[in-house]
Each structure stands twice: as structure tokens, then as C-alpha cells.
């Protein structure tokens, strides 16, 4: 199926799901507005007890209707999002390379994430899993979505302030973004990580300084094999990571890991890619931007191939 065909089908599905949600946020806003006007009239014109009773009945009716409508909207949103991923996103990925496979669920495991040691351990799920072979390299690309942590409900204002600070710290520290994993026909003897210099990334341990001054300003390098690290982190590859670091787009703070004969690239992002939004206009230009995101991540493999060719010599 072409992307244009998928676009038409998805747009029709969006209309169908909006209709199932019975008018949606616009209708809800209208009803709430009518109720607010009635309440204002009661206050301004002092309409008395009878009108107050009618207002109270209207309030409970509106409350009941809103709760039932919320369920309808959630159901319609989930149905549309599932269709969006299975039809539109699958066609979008297929247009990049028809041999690539896409699944709305799956990706990096918890053990792999923790083994990299770049970010602190957190509970997450992986989604939007793209797999394939690019320029002779087997890869997988996915999104990591951190689960919300639980916080106690407290009455003490000082404890509440601390909990609020903890919430803000966790929001910033827990990784959310994209992970690219590549498998090369090359054994790595040690573990090498190049960590973006950010507050929420690894900073403890012996650091290795390389010849690229700009790279040293942007990244912290930790390795168990100093000689291998210099073969892997070639000037061109360091330049590629510097370029990714400088990008002012949705992908930020790239960090890389060479371990267990695999390469991992972590890019922090608050944006959730490949999501169908029921009450937003379906935009083909937005789809093209998400294609560019995939191609941008895969472009790292080109520099990696050159690095490993030099290493094999």
C-alpha cells in the first residue's frame, strides 16, 4: 500500500472515529458553555430557588453525560490510534524501505538498557519497533516511554514541596526517547560509551579524553579498552555525534554505547512519534518529518561502517 492510499484510508477512519465520539471536545465545550451561561444568569438576575434546583439537576446530568462521553472518546482514540499505526505508520516506514518491518510494540529490553549504564534504571516500555537491514547492517529502532513513578499523598506542605521537587527531578532524569541498536560482524573486546554531557547521564568513573576538543566538550567517554575506543571513535564518527548534538530538533542529547558486539544510540526526546491524534488534522507533511527522523537515525550507520572498516584493518 502506498503512503497516499494509507493517508486516504486513515483520514476516513479518523472521521468515523470522531463520529463515534459523538462530536467530541467541541460538543463538550458547547455544553459546558451553556451551563456556565445559565449559572451566570442565576447569579446576575437572582432567579430564585426553582431555577437553582433546575441548575443543580442540569449540573448532575452534565456530569453524568461528560463521564460517559469521556469513555466514548477514549475508546474512539484507541481505535483510531491502532488503525493509524497498523495502516499509516506501516506505509510510512515501507516507503523508506519496503523490506523494513514495523510493530507497534517491542524494542530494547530492560536488561540491555540497564547494561549500557548511560541513564539511571527506570521502568519503561518500548514501542514503534522498526527492524531491517540498512547498508548491510542489521538494525532495530524503537521508542522508550518511561512509566510514571508513584508518589505518596501528603498533607504536610514541606513534605509536599519535597515530593514536588522529586517529581520534577524524576521527569528530567528518566530517559524518554529513541534507541537505535545495530549488529555488526565484529567482536568488541571491551565496552565503550560516549555520554552526552547532561545532568541526567552517567558522570562517575574514569573518563577518557580524545583528540577532538569539541567532542570532549560535548561528551564524556568511559571505556574498558582505551585502544579499542580510539579505533571505534574515529574523527568522522565523533563529528557525526557532534552534529547530532548540535541539532535543534526533537532528537537531543545523543549518547552511544559499544558493548556485547552491538552498537546502541540513545537520543533523548519528549516527543512521542508515530501517534494518531484523533482531534488533530492528519498532516502528510508531519509524516514526512517522521520519515526524516528515521533516516536521520539510520545515517549514523554510514559513519559507523567506515569506523569499523578502519578497525578491521
Per-region residue spans from a language model:
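Charged, low-complexity intrinsically disordered regions
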Residues: 90, 94-96, 103-154, 166-313
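Transmembrane-cytosolic junction motif
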Residues: 61-88
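Canonical alpha-helical transmembrane segments of integral membrane proteins
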Residues: 23-43, 59
Amino acid at each position: 500500500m502506498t503512503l497516499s492510499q494509507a493517508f486516504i484510508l486513515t483520514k476516513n477512519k479518523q472521521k468515523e472515529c470522531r463520529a463515534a465520539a459523538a462530536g467530541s471536545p467541541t460538543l463538550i465545550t458547547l455544553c459546558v458553555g451553556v451551563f456556565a451561561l445559565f449559572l451566570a444568569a442565576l447569579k446576575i438576575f437572582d432567579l430564585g430557588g426553582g431555577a437553582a434546583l433546575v441548575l443543580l439537576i442540569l449540573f448532575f446530568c452534565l456530569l453524568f453525560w461528560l463521564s460517559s462521553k469521556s469513555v466514548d472518546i477514549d475508546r474512539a482514540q484507541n481505535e483510531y490510534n491502532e488503525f493509524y499505526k497498523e495502516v499509516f505508520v506501516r506505509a510510512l516506514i515501507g516507503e523508506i524501505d519496503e523490506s523494513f518491518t514495523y510493530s507497534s510494540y517491542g524494542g530494547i529490553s530492560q536488561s540491555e538498557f540497564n547494561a549500557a549504564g548511560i541513564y539511571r534504571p527506570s521502568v519503561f516500555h518500548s514501542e514503534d519497533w522498526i527492524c531491517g537491514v540498512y547498508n548491510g547492517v542489521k538494525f532495530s529502532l524503537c521508542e522508550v516511554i518511561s512509566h510514571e513513578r508513584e508518589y505518596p499523598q501528603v498533607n504536610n506542605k514541606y513534605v509536599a514541596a519535597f515530593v514536588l521537587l522529586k517529581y520534577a527531578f524524576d521527569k528530567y532524569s528518566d530517559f524518554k526517547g529513541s534507541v537505535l541498536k545495530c549488529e555488526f560482524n565484529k567482536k568488541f573486546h571491551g565496552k565503550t560509551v560516549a555520554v552526552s554531557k547532561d545532568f541526567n547521564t552517567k558522570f562517575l568513573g574514569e573518563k577518557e579524553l580524545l583528540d577532538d576538543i569539541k567532542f570532549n566538550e560535548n561528551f564524556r567517554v568511559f571505556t574498558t579498552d582505551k585502544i579499542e575506543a580510539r579505533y571505534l571513535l574515529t574523527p568522522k564518527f565523533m563529528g557525526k555525534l557532534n552534529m547530532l548534538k548540535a541539532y535543534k530538533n526533537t532528537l537531543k542529547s545523543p549518547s552511544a554505547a559499544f558493548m556485547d558486539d552491538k552498537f546502541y544510540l540513545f537520543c533523548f526526546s519528549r516527543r512521542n512519534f508515530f501517534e494518531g491524534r484523533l482531534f488533530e488534522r492528519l498532516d502528510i507533511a508531519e509524516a514526512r518529518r517522521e520519515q526524516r527522523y528515521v533516516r536521520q537515525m539510520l545515517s549514523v550507520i554510514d559513519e559507523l561502517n567506515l569506523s569499523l572498516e578502519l578497525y578491521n584493518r
